[in-house]
Amino acid sequence: EMKDQEKTENMEEPRIDKTIYTGRPENMEGRLEKEIAVYDFLDSLGIEYKRVDHEALMTMEACEEVDHLLEAKICKNLFLCNRQKTDFYLLLMPGEKPFKTKFLSKQIGTARLSFADGEQMEEYLNITPGSLSLMGLIFDKEKKVHLVIDKEVLDEEYFGCHPCINTSTLLMKTSDVKEKILPALGHEYQVVELPTE
Protein backbone atom coordinates (compact mmCIF):
# COMPACT_ATOMS: atom_id res chain seq x y z
CA GLU A 1 0.00 0.00 0.00
CA MET A 2 2.78 2.41 0.92
CA LYS A 3 4.38 1.86 -2.47
CA ASP A 4 1.22 2.87 -4.28
CA GLN A 5 0.93 5.94 -2.14
CA GLU A 6 4.51 6.93 -2.91
CA LYS A 7 3.84 6.49 -6.59
CA THR A 8 0.91 8.86 -6.57
CA GLU A 9 2.83 11.38 -4.50
CA ASN A 10 5.65 11.38 -7.02
CA MET A 11 3.18 11.95 -9.81
CA GLU A 12 1.91 15.14 -8.22
CA GLU A 13 2.52 18.50 -9.82
CA PRO A 14 5.49 20.50 -8.52
CA ARG A 15 4.66 22.70 -5.56
CA ILE A 16 4.45 26.36 -6.46
CA ASP A 17 4.62 29.22 -3.99
CA LYS A 18 1.64 31.31 -5.12
CA THR A 19 3.27 34.55 -3.97
CA ILE A 20 4.46 36.86 -6.71
CA TYR A 21 7.61 38.54 -5.46
CA THR A 22 9.22 41.67 -6.83
CA GLY A 23 12.92 41.50 -7.60
CA ARG A 24 15.61 39.33 -6.05
CA PRO A 25 15.01 37.10 -3.00
CA GLU A 26 15.59 38.85 0.32
CA ASN A 27 17.32 35.79 1.67
CA MET A 28 19.96 34.30 -0.62
CA GLU A 29 20.47 31.19 1.50
CA GLY A 30 20.36 28.04 -0.60
CA ARG A 31 20.41 30.01 -3.85
CA LEU A 32 23.01 29.01 -6.40
CA GLU A 33 25.86 31.30 -7.38
CA LYS A 34 24.68 31.37 -11.00
CA GLU A 35 21.17 32.34 -9.90
CA ILE A 36 22.54 35.20 -7.79
CA ALA A 37 24.63 36.28 -10.80
CA VAL A 38 21.39 36.69 -12.78
CA TYR A 39 19.86 38.92 -10.08
CA ASP A 40 23.06 40.97 -9.95
CA PHE A 41 23.01 41.34 -13.73
CA LEU A 42 19.36 42.46 -13.81
CA ASP A 43 19.86 44.84 -10.90
CA SER A 44 22.93 46.38 -12.55
CA LEU A 45 20.70 47.25 -15.52
CA GLY A 46 17.96 48.62 -13.29
CA ILE A 47 15.43 46.11 -14.57
CA GLU A 48 12.23 45.50 -12.65
CA TYR A 49 10.94 41.95 -12.62
CA LYS A 50 8.48 39.70 -10.85
CA ARG A 51 9.55 36.36 -9.43
CA VAL A 52 7.78 33.13 -8.58
CA ASP A 53 9.52 30.35 -6.63
CA HIS A 54 8.59 26.70 -7.11
CA GLU A 55 9.87 23.16 -7.14
CA ALA A 56 11.83 22.21 -10.24
CA LEU A 57 9.71 22.48 -13.38
CA MET A 58 10.67 19.80 -15.87
CA THR A 59 7.84 20.01 -18.39
CA MET A 60 6.03 22.69 -20.37
CA GLU A 61 2.82 21.53 -18.62
CA ALA A 62 4.28 22.30 -15.21
CA CYS A 63 5.32 25.70 -16.54
CA GLU A 64 1.73 26.44 -17.53
CA GLU A 65 0.69 26.90 -13.92
CA VAL A 66 3.45 29.46 -13.45
CA ASP A 67 2.40 31.15 -16.72
CA HIS A 68 -1.11 31.35 -15.34
CA LEU A 69 0.13 32.85 -12.08
CA LEU A 70 2.28 35.45 -13.84
CA GLU A 71 -0.40 36.02 -16.50
CA ALA A 72 2.12 35.62 -19.28
CA LYS A 73 3.49 32.91 -21.52
CA ILE A 74 6.96 31.71 -20.71
CA CYS A 75 8.79 30.84 -23.91
CA LYS A 76 10.32 27.51 -24.82
CA ASN A 77 14.14 27.44 -24.82
CA LEU A 78 16.03 24.98 -27.00
CA PHE A 79 19.78 24.42 -27.18
CA LEU A 80 20.77 23.24 -30.64
CA CYS A 81 23.90 22.52 -32.61
CA ASN A 82 25.01 21.71 -36.13
CA ARG A 83 26.08 18.20 -37.03
CA GLN A 84 29.78 18.91 -36.48
CA LYS A 85 29.00 20.37 -33.03
CA THR A 86 30.93 23.51 -33.91
CA ASP A 87 28.00 25.93 -33.90
CA PHE A 88 25.59 26.24 -30.99
CA TYR A 89 22.23 27.98 -30.94
CA LEU A 90 19.92 29.08 -28.16
CA LEU A 91 16.42 29.28 -29.62
CA LEU A 92 13.63 31.15 -27.82
CA MET A 93 10.19 30.34 -29.22
CA PRO A 94 6.54 30.29 -28.07
CA GLY A 95 5.82 27.25 -25.90
CA GLU A 96 2.81 26.14 -27.90
CA LYS A 97 4.59 26.12 -31.26
CA PRO A 98 5.94 22.80 -32.48
CA PHE A 99 9.66 22.81 -33.21
CA LYS A 100 10.37 21.89 -36.82
CA THR A 101 14.02 21.80 -37.70
CA LYS A 102 13.70 22.38 -41.42
CA PHE A 103 12.05 25.79 -41.08
CA LEU A 104 14.67 26.98 -38.63
CA SER A 105 17.60 25.49 -40.59
CA LYS A 106 16.47 27.34 -43.68
CA GLN A 107 16.20 30.69 -41.90
CA ILE A 108 19.53 30.51 -40.10
CA GLY A 109 21.36 28.82 -42.96
CA THR A 110 22.50 25.74 -41.06
CA ALA A 111 21.68 22.25 -42.23
CA ARG A 112 21.25 19.25 -39.96
CA LEU A 113 20.40 20.92 -36.67
CA SER A 114 20.01 18.70 -33.65
CA PHE A 115 19.71 19.07 -29.89
CA ALA A 116 23.02 19.75 -28.20
CA ASP A 117 23.76 17.67 -25.13
CA GLY A 118 23.68 18.68 -21.48
CA GLU A 119 27.46 18.75 -21.16
CA GLN A 120 27.72 21.42 -23.82
CA MET A 121 24.90 23.35 -22.22
CA GLU A 122 26.87 23.39 -18.97
CA GLU A 123 30.13 24.22 -20.69
CA TYR A 124 28.82 27.23 -22.61
CA LEU A 125 25.88 28.48 -20.55
CA ASN A 126 26.54 27.13 -17.03
CA ILE A 127 23.07 25.57 -17.12
CA THR A 128 21.81 22.02 -16.75
CA PRO A 129 18.91 20.66 -18.85
CA GLY A 130 15.51 21.83 -17.62
CA SER A 131 16.85 25.25 -16.62
CA LEU A 132 17.78 26.61 -20.04
CA SER A 133 17.38 30.37 -20.21
CA LEU A 134 18.39 33.49 -22.07
CA MET A 135 20.20 34.42 -18.84
CA GLY A 136 22.74 31.66 -19.44
CA LEU A 137 24.32 33.95 -22.03
CA ILE A 138 25.85 36.01 -19.22
CA PHE A 139 28.26 33.08 -18.81
CA ASP A 140 29.04 32.79 -22.52
CA LYS A 141 31.83 35.36 -22.42
CA GLU A 142 33.35 34.17 -25.68
CA LYS A 143 30.03 34.51 -27.52
CA LYS A 144 30.13 30.91 -28.73
CA VAL A 145 26.35 30.55 -28.67
CA HIS A 146 24.22 32.12 -31.40
CA LEU A 147 20.96 33.54 -30.11
CA VAL A 148 17.87 32.97 -32.25
CA ILE A 149 14.49 34.41 -31.27
CA ASP A 150 11.09 33.77 -32.79
CA LYS A 151 9.51 37.12 -33.68
CA GLU A 152 6.40 36.24 -31.66
CA VAL A 153 8.44 36.12 -28.44
CA LEU A 154 9.63 39.68 -29.07
CA ASP A 155 6.09 40.82 -29.90
CA GLU A 156 4.75 39.74 -26.49
CA GLU A 157 4.48 42.45 -23.84
CA TYR A 158 6.23 40.33 -21.21
CA PHE A 159 9.14 37.92 -21.27
CA GLY A 160 9.55 35.07 -18.80
CA CYS A 161 12.61 32.95 -18.07
CA HIS A 162 14.42 30.99 -15.37
CA PRO A 163 17.35 32.58 -13.52
CA CYS A 164 19.55 29.70 -14.80
CA ILE A 165 17.77 27.29 -12.45
CA ASN A 166 14.23 25.93 -12.81
CA THR A 167 13.17 26.56 -9.21
CA SER A 168 12.25 30.18 -9.95
CA THR A 169 10.70 31.99 -12.88
CA LEU A 170 11.20 35.67 -13.64
CA LEU A 171 8.92 37.96 -15.61
CA MET A 172 10.02 41.25 -17.11
CA LYS A 173 8.98 43.63 -19.86
CA THR A 174 10.02 42.47 -23.31
CA SER A 175 11.00 46.07 -24.07
CA ASP A 176 13.62 45.79 -21.29
CA VAL A 177 14.90 42.59 -22.87
CA LYS A 178 15.27 44.31 -26.24
CA GLU A 179 16.55 47.67 -25.05
CA LYS A 180 18.70 46.71 -22.05
CA ILE A 181 19.36 42.98 -21.65
CA LEU A 182 20.29 42.04 -25.22
CA PRO A 183 22.67 45.01 -25.64
CA ALA A 184 24.27 44.22 -22.25
CA LEU A 185 24.75 40.55 -23.18
CA GLY A 186 26.41 41.68 -26.38
CA HIS A 187 25.30 38.63 -28.35
CA GLU A 188 24.12 39.36 -31.85
CA TYR A 189 20.80 37.68 -32.42
CA GLN A 190 18.71 36.61 -35.34
CA VAL A 191 14.93 36.95 -35.46
CA VAL A 192 13.10 34.09 -37.17
CA GLU A 193 9.46 33.35 -37.97
CA LEU A 194 8.54 29.76 -37.25
CA PRO A 195 5.25 28.22 -38.41
CA THR A 196 2.47 27.51 -35.92
CA GLU A 197 1.49 24.20 -37.52
Regions found by a protein language model. Give the residues of each.
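Extended, low-hydrophobicity, polar/charged segments
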Residues: 3-197
